[in-house]
A protein has these predicted regions:
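Short catalytic/metal-binding and nucleic-acid-binding patches
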Residues: 1-150
């Protein structure tokens, strides 16, 4: 299936945005429609790279859910962090070290103060259920949850 060309998004965090905002990210694999991410060893490697970036202070991933050909995450970036660069560097690592090909761009949405992190996470964790991969969201094994996140 050919890869759709999408409009390039500007991932610069606006100056008026709260420095402690949480971002909802979606990153898609190339090609779509194949199980690239949902294998136990692969998921472990991805989640280890998430933890490594956390240890460097580049981001704090509240939760990440892997689907076969894309991932969703709720992420906090440091006030000095360049989201586009941080995500781009991580995607390059996944490509170069784990041979995971990802689309050049990604989707991000800054959660406003009135948006509930819990509501967004409840929606995301139902993805495997909606896709018919599991009957119960709690049965999906490809989830990373940062310590201290409920």
């Amino acid at each position: 299936m050919p890869c759709r060309t999408r409009k390039r998004l500007n991932h610069v965090i606006p100056v008026f945005a709260e420095w402690d905002a949480t971002y909802f990210l979606t990153i898609c694999c190339i090609p779509r429609g194949m199980n690239t991410l949902c294998r136990t060893e692969r998921a472990i490697e991805i989640f280890q790279s998430v933890q490594f970036y956390e240890s460097l202070g580049k981001w704090s991933v509240r939760v990440m859910l892997l689907m076969p050909d894309h991932l969703h995450a709720l992420v906090d970036f440091p006030f000095w962090g360049d989201m586009s660069r941080i995500v781009g560097d991580w995607k390059r690592y996944l490509n170069n070290q784990l041979e995971i090909r990802l689309q050049p761009n990604f989707f991000d949405h800054r959660l406003r103060r009135d948006e509930s992190h819990d509501e967004k996470w409840k929606y995301v964790k139902m993805n495997p259920v909606r896709a018919g991969l599991v009957k119960n969201a709690e049965d999906w094994p490809y989830v990373y949850q940062s310590p201290g996140t409920r």
